[in-house]
Structure formats: structure tokens, C-alpha cells
């Protein structure tokens, strides 16, 4: 009835504006989260996830369109997902965006400034978006959920500063800082190399959630012992790709060994196996670290 243009982009801008009027202010959401956290971390995330769906920040009606199933394989029961929930790009909105004055605010869709942002045709509205402040690695980080989650309670943890992705020892420590706060969640990082793709490399962030994937349940195929790290259980996981699992009681010790492995792998070249550490100055070797707490380890 003429309140907005009849396209997905403009309807999303409009309904998010309406929901923003009903969404509690950030301070109230943060206070409720930490009050519940005092009872248990799971109580806090359960409530925050339900809240994010109630405000329509997580568009559950669209997520229901995704095709998901589990199929048995020699490596365990694999989760297969076909993402059908993200709306198609609207040609009219694309044309309108080309005519708009370019904006560098927010710097990206992960920046904390997205909370409460009105949006535009080429940047989603976030008036119904609320984020939870955390401390990780001695600095300010924030927790939110993915509006288009691929699994249960698919969360995003992002740096309070707009700083690039980087896999190093400090990244490992931040992952452990998170699972110590939320032991029922796993958390991991995408690779930090442009050639891999699939991530926003300009803003440091991790992804996690409340789900158990097949790789988590996969057994150790070949056990290894690292000199000087007898307290760390290590081994190659039975998986179609190269996966090294490290397990121990002390996060700092695991971080030390993981960093040692990372540094060795970054410079590793084996032409016979078609593995090159770099070509024309472009690095090729990195890892995708994932942290979780299982049975106290």
C-alpha cells in the first residue's frame, strides 16, 4: 500500500525499521544477558538466541527454506546444506545503489557500528540488531548471531576494531578465551588468505555455535607425540582433508604447540606433492583453527 517499494531490499529496510522501534535498547539487552550468564552461560545464549529470532534479526522464516540433510560416509554422518534463505539481489536496488553517494560507514558489515544502523539499499538495516560485549585477548570483542545461520546458534565473534584477519598465536588464545566463557559452544576461524575465499578478511572475526559436526566425532587415525609436549595428546583425524587434533588441560600449552605447527607449515614446500609455501610473493599455507571444550579439555 505504498509505504515502501515492492522489493525484498526495500521491504527489509522497512520491516527492520519497524522492529527497531520495538527492540529494547542495547544496555537493557546487555544487562539481561549478563544477569542470565551469572546463572549459566547456556541460559544467557539460549535467551539471546531466542531474542535475536523474536526481533526478526534472525529471519527464521527464511532459514526454514534451506535444504538440510545428513548423509552417511566413511568419515561419519556428514551435514549437507543448500543455502536457499538469502534473498536474491534486486535489480532495481542494485541500480539505485549505483546512483547513491558512496559511504564508508560502517566500514563493513561486521563493525560494531552496524548495531542500530538504518541501512541503505546496498547495506542491510540493523535497527533490530543488538551485540554483546566481551573481552578476548585483552581487548574488546563482541558476540552476535549470524542472520543467516548454517547450523544451530551460528554465532559470530568480532573484534571491536576494524582490523584484518590474522592467524597466529594470539588468535589461538582468543579462541580459548571464548570457549572458556562459553564451554557449550565451539568457535573457529576462517583462513586468513585471500586465495581461500569465503570470509571477510578485512575484519578479524570468528564463527562458532552450539552444534556437533562429524569432524568433531571423527576418531584419531594416527597418534603423534611432539618432543617437549608430552602433556598434549596429538593425532591426525580420520577425515578427507588434513586435520590435526591437539588436546590438553592447559590452553597456553596447546597454543604454544599449535603456533609451532603453524610456523612450520607456513614455510613448508614440497614440489613433488605440488605444495608451495608461496608463489610470486603470495602465501599459500595457513590453517583453520577450531577450539572446543570436551570433558574438561
Name what the model sees in each region.
Residues 141-147, 171, 175-179, 225-232:
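Structured alpha-helical segments in the cores of large, soluble enzyme domains
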Residues 128-130, 160-187:
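Helical scaffold of the NTase/Pol beta-like nucleotidyltransferase catalytic core
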Residues 166, 184-187, 193-199, 210-297:
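Conserved His + Asp/Glu catalytic blocks
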Residues 82-86, 147-149, 161-162, 191-193, ...:
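Short, flexible loop/turn elements at secondary-structure junctions
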Residues 155, 199-202:
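Short glycine/proline-enriched turns and hinge-like loops at secondary-structure junctions
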Residues 1-164, 238-240, 255-258, 264-297:
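Active-site microenvironments that recognize anionic phosphate/pyrophosphate groups
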Amino acid at each position: 500500500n505504498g509505504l515502501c517499494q515492492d522489493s525484498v531490499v526495500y521491504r527489509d529496510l522497512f520491516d527492520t525499521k519497524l522492529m527497531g522501534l520495538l527492540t529494547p535498547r542495547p544496555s537493557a539487552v546487555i544487562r539481561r544477558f549478563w544477569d542470565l550468564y551469572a546463572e549459566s552461560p547456556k541460559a544467557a545464549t539460549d535467551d539471546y538466541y531466542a531474542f535475536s529470532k523474536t526481533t526478526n534479526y534472525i529471519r527464521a522464516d527464511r532459514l526454514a527454506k534451506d535444504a538440510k540433510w545428513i548423509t552417511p560416509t566413511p568419515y561419519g554422518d556428514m551435514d549437507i546444506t543448500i543455502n536457499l534463505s538469502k534473498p536474491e539481489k534486486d535489480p532495481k536496488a542494485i541500480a539505485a545503489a549505483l546512483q547513491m553517494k558512496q559511504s564508508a560507514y560502517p566500514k563493513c558489515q561486521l563493525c560494531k557500528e552496524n548495531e542500530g544502523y538504518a541501512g541503505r539499499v546496498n547495506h542491510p538495516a540493523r535497527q533490530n540488531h543488538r551485540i554483546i560485549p566481551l573481552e578476548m585477548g585483552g581487548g574488546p570483542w563482541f558476540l552476535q548471531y549470524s542472520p543467516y545461520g548454517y547450523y544451530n546458534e551460528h554465532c559470530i565473534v568480532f573484534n571491536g576494531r576494524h582490523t584484518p584477519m590474522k592467524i597466529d598465536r594470539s588468535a589461538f588464545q582468543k579462541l580459548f578465551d571464548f570457549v572458556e566463557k562459553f564451554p557449550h559452544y565451539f568457535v573457529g576461524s576462517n583462513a586468513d588468505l585471500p586465495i581461500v575465499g569465503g570470509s571477510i578478511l578485512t575484519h578479524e572475526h570468528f564463527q562458532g555455535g552450539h552444534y556437533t559436526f562429524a569432524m568433531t566425532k571423527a576418531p584419531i587415525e594416527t597418534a603423534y607425540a611432539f618432543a617437549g609436549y608430552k602433556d598434549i595428546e596429538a593425532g591426525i583425524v580420520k577425515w578427507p582433508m588434513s586435520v590435526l587434533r591437539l588436546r590438553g588441560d592447559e590452553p597456553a600449552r596447546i597454543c604454544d604447540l599449535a603456533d609451532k605447527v603453524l610456523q612450520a607449515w607456513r614455510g613448508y614446500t614440497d614440489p613433488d606433492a605440488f605444495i608451495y609455501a608461496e608463489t610470486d610473493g603470495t602465501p599459500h599455507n595457513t590453517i583453520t583453527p577450531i577450539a572446543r571444550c570436551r570433558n574438561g579439555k
